Regions:
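Functional-site microenvironments in short loops/helix caps that host divalent-cation chemistry
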Residues: 21-27, 48-49, 55, 60, ...
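Short capping motifs at secondary-structure boundaries
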Residues: 79, 86, 95-104, 308-318, ...
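Short, structured beta-strand segments at or near domain termini in extracellular proteins/domains
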Residues: 462-477
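Short proline/glycine-enriched turn/loop segments at secondary-structure junctions
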Residues: 424-427, 453-460
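Post-signal peptide N-terminal segment of mature Sec-exported envelope proteins
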Residues: 24-51
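C-terminal motif of bacterial Sec signal peptides marking the signal peptidase cleavage site
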Residues: 15-16
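Sec-dependent N-terminal signal peptides
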Residues: 5-12
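Non-catalytic, alpha-helical, charged scaffold/linker segments
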Residues: 109-242
Length: 498
């Protein structure tokens, strides 16, 4: 009886606490809205680069290059960076996701045609198993039904596995859909019928706030002087003569592009040279899974970043106590150089010293050391993404192997007018994008952490890859201190070895 009475009193007490208004719970004080506790998580395969200041630009006696990269003290925020360049295996995950989503969309459309758009109870065979999961609207919530009816937003069925074995295709409709994604029979070579990779297209949204704010200011200044000021609309690819009002959509561009790497770069980059084996096998063969992906454009690299962000946040939404993560993106030019230096000031290379060989006579990066000699260390083309020793931030191949796309546009005088805090110059009209780090086909000058080079954003190359960064939210001084301590330990270890 006493236990029952105690439980009853506890229940009444709980109800009385829950019925209090917000002002009573806060006792009239400003306590803020209570949210979930945020704990930063290091993404898999990334390392923390603690923010700080450094002298950016040429620090040696390369006088001609001072016009291109004069010294300037800048500060960058903390961020995570991929320890290696994005590998073929990692990029294949992106390509396979795009392939599967495109195929599932085509199967769902065919299923809707076959079933006549009639609701299903789930007891369907063949292509009906791949119908949109909202085809049966009886179980849809109000929001999902509204989005389907008003915006035609459909959900694919990812629970049913795709069948790639031709002998196991469930029905003729499935067969016809799958056959549409392979190259035509008259283009088959060596009896191998491969995917028509031009079908694998990824659509994504990109926001360029700074560029549009600059355009808005140009318009405001021009209109104040009664001038006509055209603005470029990247979505419609045309100039608008009227003031557009700058809605939210003006800050968003919609891109759709093919994601499969251009494997022909191994042949087109080098005339009168036999590189067909690399063209045939480099991207898809397991032997090269851990090698850096090449043949991707600057826009394809950005599309990969968008997909990686979406994939991570899709998982985060399935967990109640998980917060959404900031975007994955290409590093700015300043972030790349800061990370490449590995905590060393005024160093020529990521490993510090002015030499490209260690004390045992071994090269410390994959590059072209002598005229006509690409393979003095048996590395003719690229090597594994984690080959050679990492720098002070545990980042591999920040010099050599493949050059890397960064977010910044190439402007010769960018260092003169860019900000000193998180500097970045990315002009939407300038298709020249910075590449950094040098590659397997470059001489050692391009391996220097301050050397700048560029390529057009739509031009894939057999010597250009990329790695991504991920913003660190907050200012965890403990984490930064621990990282700096680790860097000092590595420096001391290297000093003792020497």
């Amino acid at each position: 009886m006493r236990k029952l009475l105690a439980l009853s009193l506890l229940f009444v007490f709980a109800l009385s606490c829950g019925s209090k208004s917000g002002s009573k719970r806060s006792k009239g004080e400003l306590v803020g809205v209570q949210g979930k506790k945020y704990y930063p998580e290091k993404p898999f395969g990334m390392g923390l680069v603690p923010g700080g200041s450094f002298i950016m630009g040429k620090s040696d006696d390369d006088l001609p290059a001072l016009d291109d990269a004069p010294t300037k003290t800048v500060t960058v925020r903390s961020y995570y960076m991929d320890e290696t360049e994005i590998t073929n295996a990692e990029y294949r995950q992106f390509v396979y996701w795009v392939r599967d989503s495109v195929i599932r969309t085509a199967l769902a459309d065919r299923a809707e045609d076959v079933l006549g758009g009639e609701p299903t109870d789930g007891n369907v065979d063949g292509i009906g198993e791949y119908a949109y999961i909202d085809a049966d609207t009886s179980d849809l919530g109000v929001y999902d039904k509204y989005m389907k009816d008003v915006y035609d937003r459909r959900k694919l069925n990812w629970d049913t596995d795709l069948i790639f074995d031709r002998s196991e295709y469930p029905d003729e409709d499935y067969l016809e859909v799958m056959e549409s994604f392979f190259i035509p029979e008259d283009e088959v070579f060596n009896d191998i019928r491969t995917w028509d990779v031009t079908n694998f297209k990824f659509a994504y949204l990109d926001s360029r706030v700074q560029e549009y704010l600059d355009e808005k200011q140009i318009l405001i200044d021009a209109l104040a002087n009664d001038e006509i000021a055209p603005i470029y609309n990247p979505t419609d690819k045309q100039l608008e003569e009227e003031f557009p009002g700058f809605k939210r959509s003006n800050f968003i561009t919609r891109e759709t592009l093919e994601v499969y790497p251009d494997t022909t770069v191994w042949i087109t980059d080098f005339k009168y040279s036999y590189n067909e084996p690399m063209h045939n096998d480099y991207f898809w063969h397991d032997a090269y899974s851990s090698y850096p992906v090449v043949g991707v454009t600057w826009k394809q690299a950005n599309a990969f970043c968008q997909w990686r962000t979406n994939t991570k946040n899709a998982y985060q939404r399935t967990k109640k106590k998980k917060s959404l993560v900031p975007e994955f993106r290409l590093p700015t030019e300043a972030e790349w150089e800061y990370a490449a230096r590995g905590g060393l000031q005024s160093a020529m290379y990521p490993w510090g010293g002015p030499y490209t060989k260690n004390d045992r006579g071994c090269f410390m990066a994959n590059f072209k050391p002598m005229r006509g000699d690409y393979a003095v260390d048996q590395a003719l083309y690229t090597v594994e993404a984690n080959a050679y020793d990492p720098n002070g931030y545990n980042l591999y191949n920040m010099a050599g192997n493949v050059s890397e796309w960064v977010d910044s546009s190439y402007e010769q005088d960018a260092y003169e007018y860019s900000a000193s805090m998180n500097p970045n110059v990315n002009n939407i009209y300038n298709e020249k994008k910075i590449i950094r780090g040098g590659s397997w086909k470059d001489v050692k000058y391009f391996l220097q952490v301050s050397s700048r080079d560029y390529e057009y954003q739509d031009q894939p190359r057999s010597y250009i890859g990329f790695r991504t960064v991920h913003d660190y939210l907050g200012a965890d001084l403990t984490a930064n201190a621990m990282t700096n301590t680790t860097i000092r330990k590595r420096k001391n270890q290297r000093s003792s070895i020497k």
